[in-house]
Amino acid sequence: MATRSPSVVISDDEPGYDLDLFCIPNHYVEDLEKVFIPHGVIMDRTERLARDVMKEMGGHHIVALCVLKGGYKFFADLLDYIKALNRNSDRSIPMTVDFIRLKSYCNDQSTGDIKVIGGDDLSTLTGKNVLIVEDIIDTGKTMQTLLSLVKRYNLKMVKVASLLVKRTSRSVGYRPDFVGFEIPDKFVVGYALDYNEYFRDLNHICVISETGKAKYKA
């Protein structure tokens, strides 16, 4: 029986790292409180998740479905590691990619209203083994809605990999199959996670400051 893989749990009192210890774009220095997860740690953890995905799904042709926009960096890096495992293993699998775009945030709050604003015809997923790749699970409502949508197409298998899962009282209890980091209820940006489209160009995952929220508020 398949089990959900463990995650790196970051405690509520984790202090993070001073911005001065890392290379931060000057235009964001006043907008961030701290570096929360350095880029190198993200990459090492993603490499391990790739191994977990291959162990769980590696006997099948996989359709990797990227949730845009925030998931694109994690998606690209995860697939690079999976491709490396494919190249260096006796057992390799074909993989194809597809994309879907959802919208559920306004400023720093998940609205609970899920809008599908892009993506190809999901009927192409019928009978396939699908790996959905997401940047962050907050309340879990977005992913539950997406799963209910794709399951209408009689998938052979569906698994979810999320770089982050947030501990929050607003959670509906959903937990992905593969999780990079479990984090406190803080609004984080960087590594393609955005605040109203800003901060996607930041390599590290950081905690946004109140100054940053005010500056980039919609």
UniProtKB/Swiss-Prot annotation:
The UniProt record lists the keyword Cell inner membrane: no
Keywords from the named record: Acetylation, Cytoplasm, Glycosyltransferase, Isopeptide bond, Magnesium, Metal-binding, Nucleotide-binding, Phosphoprotein, Purine salvage, Transferase, Ubl conjugation
InterPro entries: HGPRT, Hxn_phspho_trans, PRibTrfase_dom, PRTase-like
Family annotation (Gene3D superfamilies): 3.40.50.2020
Cited SUPFAM superfamilies: PRTase-like
Linked residues for Glycyl lysine isopeptide (Lys-Gly) (interchain with G-Cter in SUMO1): K115
Compartmental location: Cytoplasm
Active site: D138
One term of GO molecular function: guanine phosphoribosyltransferase activity
Function: Converts guanine to guanosine monophosphate, and hypoxanthine to inosine monophosphate. Transfers the 5-phosphoribosyl group from 5-phosphoribosylpyrophosphate onto the purine. Plays a central role in the generation of purine nucleotides through the purine salvage pathway.
Similarity remark: Belongs to the purine/pyrimidine phosphoribosyltransferase family.
Protein name as it appears in the record: Hypoxanthine-guanine phosphoribosyltransferase
Lineage: Eukaryota, Metazoa, Chordata, Craniata, Vertebrata
